[in-house]
């Protein structure tokens, strides 16, 4: 899933750049939205991973 969020960010960057160069504000804004969405997904993925690691650590220490 991390690859998907990185891809979405890269795709957004390309769209934003092309939109900027061609003076296409719709494409530029779409790129900004894709980048923001990709960053948000990456943030959520990282939070889930950290929560899972924390839960696993707590479960591992429970029996001690």
Curated annotation (Swiss-Prot):
It holds the Pfam family CsbD. Residues 25-40 have a biased composition (Basic and acidic residues). Residues 1-40 are annotated as: Disordered. Belongs to the UPF0337 (CsbD) family. This is UPF0337 protein SAOUHSC_00845. It comes from Staphylococcus aureus (strain NCTC 8325 / PS 47).
């Amino acid at each position: 899933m991390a690859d998907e969020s990185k891809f979405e960010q890269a795709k957004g960057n390309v769209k934003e750049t092309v939109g900027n160069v061609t003076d296409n504000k719709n494409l530029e804004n779409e790129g900004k939205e894709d980048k923001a969405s990709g960053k948000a997904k990456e943030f959520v993925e990282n939070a889930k991973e950290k929560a899972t690691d924390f839960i696993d650590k707590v479960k591992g220490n429970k029996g001690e």
